[in-house]
Regions:
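Conserved N-terminal phosphate-binding loop of PLP-dependent enzymes in the Aspartate aminotransferase
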Residues: 1-178
């Protein structure tokens, strides 16, 4: 299972744990390195033992800075209950976006994704471009797809500010259509 985006963000077990998928192999990255290049492949004992009988090459196999970064990430992850934090602030963002989507049907259809990474599904592509541009003009990078990730840096105050800015932009777009 590809857990590049979901691994660690949704807890130690990732999406496969949250949704009950059986996995023989798992791939982790991105969040594990917190910006440093790293990827991890894990699997069942039988699969991982089979790997020991073959030769695997990696361009970055001797790059130890990323391993140190991953070690630090895992320490912070456990100490700060990162997945729990992401779930709380993500739910706040998701529910706020849902209120916006429910109010402005001429601009948005719904909030989509999951709390940890969600987006507003606009009525059409042109509207999503206008939403992203309006948010950028407000100093907010708000992507048009499910890559609006919450992070450990997001607090309730930060999320409320995001929702205010997005809400103002959506309100302005709706007013232009009236």
């Amino acid at each position: 299972i590809d857990e590049i985006k979901t691994g660690l963000r949704l807890g130690w077990q990732g999406a496969s744990g949250r949704y009950g998928f059986h996995r023989d192999l798992i791939v982790l990255g991105k969040a594990l390195g917190n910006g440093f290049p790293i990827a991890v492949v894990g699997g069942s004992r039988a699969i991982m033992e089979a790997v020991t009988r073959t030769w695997i090459s990696s361009t970055l196999a001797t790059e130890f800075v990323s391993l140190a970064a991953a070690d630090a990430v895992l320490q912070v992850y456990e100490r700060e209950n990162v997945a729990g934090h992401l779930a709380v602030v993500g739910r706040r963002l998701y529910e706020g976006l849902d209120r916006i989507a429910s109010t402005y049907h001429t601009v948005t259809r719904a909030v989509k994704g999951i709390p940890e990474f969600c987006y507003l599904d606009c009525v059409d592509d042109a509207m999503s471009v206008r939403l992203a541009g309006g948010c950028a003009a407000q100093g907010l990078i708000f992507k048009r797809d499910a890559y609006n990730f919450v992070s450990l840096a997001h607090t309730a105050t930060v999320v409320d500010d995001i929702l205010q800015r997005v809400g103002d932009v959506v309100d302005s777009l709706a007013s232009q259509l009236a």
